A protein has these predicted regions:
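Generic detector of intrinsically disordered, low-complexity, polar/charged segments
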Residues: 20, 29-31, 72, 129, ...
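Alpha-helical cap/lid subdomain in secreted, periplasmic
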Residues: 62-191, 195, 199-202
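Residues in flexible loops and secondary-structure boundaries
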Residues: 30, 34, 178, 196-197, ...
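A sequence-level detector of short, solvent-exposed, charge-rich linear segments
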Residues: 38-41, 89, 93, 213-216
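Serine-esterase "nucleophile elbow" of acetyl-processing enzymes
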Residues: 1-58, 64-69
Length: 219
């Protein structure tokens, strides 16, 4: 490879050199020993760095100040369990359908506000960005599974509407994580599941870096 071609490759917009993950999706997942970068992408085509920013870090520091200098790509991925737990639908029984829907709507409003602020931080950074939908849980109890899936659909609808309005592309994790082997527990992904998500997300970032301008859905 000639020096010029090497320089062109290093400057290519699809080269992920510093990925910032906005969200807590990796917070409770055991990626094993060593660097998270190696667990997510075992054989990368170039050295890269991962910075994870929890939502409070972004919201407390202010949008622009939270994103580190040198970021080349951003992914927004929030733990779906957070949304479900906040809704309160899996704890006890509502007095009526109206009460249940009101509780869910209030939790979805709070979630949407937080998620919108994360998207604003990403768009202000001006780098290729993807938004991930919430990963569905796999509860053993059928009734719990139905309730969780219903609640998750409401939160994911908020994500899809906001991401589309912001012209951000989407990784649809409900279609990516569709096998039992993708899960280490009812609510946490396995190494295989995390690797699958990383592969789809990486492909999405490569694509939108070279072909920006419109919202796409990847799975």
């Amino acid at each position: 490879m000639t020096p010029n071609s090497l320089q062109e490759e290093q400057n290519s917009p699809d080269i992920i050199r510093h990925l910032v993950l906005l969200g807590d999706a990796l917070q409770n997942i055991d990626l094993g020993k060593g660097q998270a970068e190696n667990a997510l992408v075992p054989r990368p085509r170039n050295p890269w760095k991962l910075t994870v920013l929890q939502p409070p870090e972004v919201l407390q520091q202010g949008r622009v100040r939270a994103i580190p200098a040198g970021v080349t790509h951003i992914g927004i991925c929030v733990d779906g369990g957070w949304a479900i737990e906040t809704s309160g639908l899996l704890k006890g029984r509502a007095q009526s359908i109206q009460d249940a829907l009101d509780t869910l709507a209030a939790a979805a409003d709070e979630f949407e506000n937080m998620f919108t602020r994360l998207m604003t931080a990403a768009t202000e950074a001006g780098v290729p960005t993807i938004v991930c939908t919430l990963v569905p849980a796999r509860y053993m109890e059928p009734s719990q599974e139905r309730v969780a899936a219903t609640a998750l659909a409401i939160f994911n609808d908020r994500i899809l509407r906001r991401a589309t309005a912001a012209r951000l592309s989407i990784v649809e994790l409900r279609l990516v994580c569709d096998e039992d082997s993708d899960y280490a527990s009812e609510t946490l992904l396995s190494h295989a599941g995390v690797r699958k998500v990383a592969n789809v997300a990486r492909s999405a970032l490569y694509d939108i870096s070279r072909n920006p301008g419109r919202t796409r859905v990847y799975f």
